[in-house]
Structure formats: structure tokens, C-alpha cells
Design a protein with these regions (language model features):
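Conserved glycine-centered short motifs in functionally critical loops
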Residues: 94-205
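OB-fold/S1-family RNA-binding modules
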Residues: 1-98, 103, 179-205
Length: 205
């Protein structure tokens, strides 16, 4: 680039950043993607051409959507989905819920029993809620593109056997994550430590 600059007139563009199309293709997890739909004609054409350089992308359909009466964003309720994806509180099917908070130093995730507060077989209920929470946490890490240090406060994590089982389960869930994700350990206070490689901005950013 330096050598090029030496022999180029002033105000000449020496380089340009990655195109939107290239950025999109780079971030697609092709093995898990069946179809890409866009309502932007130019982007559609660029995607069709660019994906030819990616062998694994050939199995993914690229569709151009055109309907002036029903925009693509409204068809898939994108605004509502995006709003939900940015909420701190996420309800679980069991009645429990997660609280996800991002700070500059780490991501804190708190698991709560919520509406699921039956005292009968409490220990077993806690284990079920924790497993359900682990599954949702693995999904949220990818959905929100959370990275760095992630600290998870599961319910009643005092029993070492329960800790070990949950560690293994969480490890199996993040194994399919395209970003390097490591379930480190459970601290003396019962907090699970997870690290996830940073690749781009979070959904909130």
C-alpha cells in the first residue's frame, strides 16, 4: 500500500473497506443456513455472484423478496424480534427467567426460578430449570453475539455433582458455536465462567 501511495496522485483512493456483501457472507454459518432472503435487489445480485466462491454456500438458497403491500420486515416481525433480542429479561418455558446484563468488563447472566417455585422435589426442579437455562444461554450468546468473559449465576449450584453435570452439558451446547467458546469452571461461589471469542460488535452495539 505504501509503495502504491508513492506513485499515485493526490486524492486517489488507495484502498477500500470490505463490502457489505463480503461482510455478510463472512459471518454466515453456512452449514446451519438453509435460505437467505433479502428485499434489496442489488444485494441479492451481489450475494448470488459472491457465493460462487464459497463451495459450502451452494446448498443455501438465496431469495429475492418483492411485495410492496407486505414489506419483508413486517412479514417476519423483525422489529418485534429485534426488540425481544435486546431485552434484559428472557422468560423460560418452565416459568423461570434469565437476566442478561452487559458491562464493560464482563457479561452477567442470572438464572431465576420465577413462577416455577414449587417446593416439592425442589432440587430436581432446580436442575431442570438450570438445564433449560443453559440451552437458552447458549442460544443467546450467538443471537446477541456476546463475547469476552461471561459469568452465569445458576440456581443452587452448591452440589459438586450438579456442577459437574451442568458444566458438561453447557460444554456440549457451545461446542457447535462457530465462535471459540470455552466453559471454564464453576467458582467457589457457584458462578459458572465462560469465555467466548470476540469477532464483531454485539447485537446491542
Amino acid at each position: 500500500l505504501y509503495q502504491k501511495a508513492l506513485h499515485t496522485p493526490c486524492y486517489t483512493k488507495l484502498s477500500k473497506g470490505e463490502s457489505i456483501t463480503a461482510s455478510i457472507l463472512k459471518d454466515v454459518h453456512w452449514k446451519e443456513t438453509e435460505k437467505i432472503i433479502t428485499d434489496q435487489k442489488t444485494l441479492y445480485e451481489e450475494l448470488c455472484v459472491s457465493r460462487q466462491d464459497i463451495p459450502v454456500a451452494s446448498m443455501c438458497a438465496i431469495e429475492y423478496y418483492e411485495d410492496s403491500l407486505l414489506p419483508l420486515a413486517r412479514l417476519y416481525n423483525l422489529e418485534r424480534e429485534l426488540d425481544q433480542a435486546l431485552q434484559e429479561k428472557i422468560w423460560l418455558k418452565s416459568g423461570g427467567f434469565l437476566i442478561i446484563q452487559q458491562t464493560e468488563a464482563f457479561v452477567a447472566i442470572d438464572v431465576n426460578t420465577g413462577k416455577h417455585s414449587s417446593k416439592k422435589d425442589a432440587e430436581e426442579n432446580y436442575k431442570q430449570i438450570n438445564r433449560e437455562a443453559a440451552l437458552e444461554i447458549a442460544r443467546q450468546l450467538r443471537l446477541r453475539n456476546l463475547s469476552g468473559m461471561i459469568l452465569v449465576d445458576f440456581i443452587n449450584m452448591k452440589n459438586t455433582n450438579d456442577q459437574s453435570e451442568l458444566l458438561q452439558y453447557m460444554g456440549s451446547l457451545v461446542r457447535s458455536d462457530p465462535m471459540q467458546t470455552v466453559v471454564v469452571d464453576v467458582t467457589a461461589l457457584g458462578i459458572m465462567e465462560i469465555t467466548r471469542k470476540k469477532s464483531a460488535k454485539t447485537l446491542a452495539e
